[in-house]
Regions:
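Active-site core of metal-dependent hydrolases
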Residues: 1-108, 113-114
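Short secondary-structure capping/turn micro-motifs that flank functional sites
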Residues: 73-75, 148, 182
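Short Asp/Glu-rich motifs
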Residues: 77, 151, 202
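His/Asp/Glu-enriched, well-ordered alpha-helical/loop segment
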Residues: 86-173
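Short low-complexity, flexible loop/linker segments enriched in glycine and/or proline
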Residues: 80-85, 156, 188-191
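C-terminal cap of metal-dependent C-N hydrolases
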Residues: 162-206
Length: 206
């Protein structure tokens, strides 16, 4: 109802942990109600070895599977996408995200906090480069997981997610080695020739 009132998609983002139940509540809801699968957007879907398989299942039902960028193993994310394609998963239902400066944490065998940090939003661009360089993926395909797929998932397409007449002028200009050269957001120059022109409210002069 809130989505309809606000003119938004009205989605449910599900923060996945490593619990044994995984996506069982979602599949139960789909089986017992008329809620469309596209309503559910589970994220952190590569957190465990089992979660991707459940994400593939949800994607085949019309839902979405969001993967948090992970550069700890350069071959892991390219391999995960290759596996999804091999299983016939509709690849337009898969997205990548950064967790938006969210915290990450590791715990010892007794459940005590061992370390904590921040997930940098810059991991999204780094993951894109990883898919192209380490995964030998075509840049046009790699972009979809960060652009058009995400825009469709949030029902912001066609205003967002692609370059076309009438769409928001959101553009990235890349150098020959995939270095980020220029960023344009809704027609406004944010980064030009590697020089930052616009900063956020809480950003310092770094």
């Amino acid at each position: 109802v809130a989505g309809m009132i606000g003119g938004k998609a009205g989605i449910i983002v599900i923060h996945m942990g490593d619990g044994a139940g995984r996506l069982d509540p979602v599949f139960e809801a789909l089986a017992r109600t008329n809620i469309p699968a596209k309503t559910f957007h589970p994220t952190h879907m590569a957190r465990t070895e089992e979660l991707p398989q459940e994400g593939f299942r949800l994607a085949k039902l019309g839902g979405y599977m969001d993967i948090t960028c992970d550069l700890s193993d350069p071959g892991r994310m390219p391999a995960l996408l290759k596996e999804a394609r091999g299983q016939g998963v509709p690849m337009e239902r898969l997205t990548f995200s950064s967790d938006g400066q969210g915290s990450w944490s590791n715990y010892d065998a007794y459940g005590n906090l061992a370390e904590i940090g921040v997930t940098d939003v810059g991991t999204m661009y780094a993951q894109l480069v990883n898919l192209v360089r380490d995964g030998n993926m075509d840049l046009a395909e790699a972009l979809t997981y960060f652009t058009s797929n995400a825009a469709r998932a949030l029902e912001l397409y066609p205003a967002k997610g692609h370059v076309a007449p009438g769409a928001d002028a959101d553009l990235l200009l890349l150098g020959p080695d995939l270095e980020l050269d220029t960023v344009i957001a809704r027609g406004k120059m944010m980064l030009e020739n590697g020089r930052l022109l616009v900063k956020g409210t809480y950003e310092t002069n770094i």
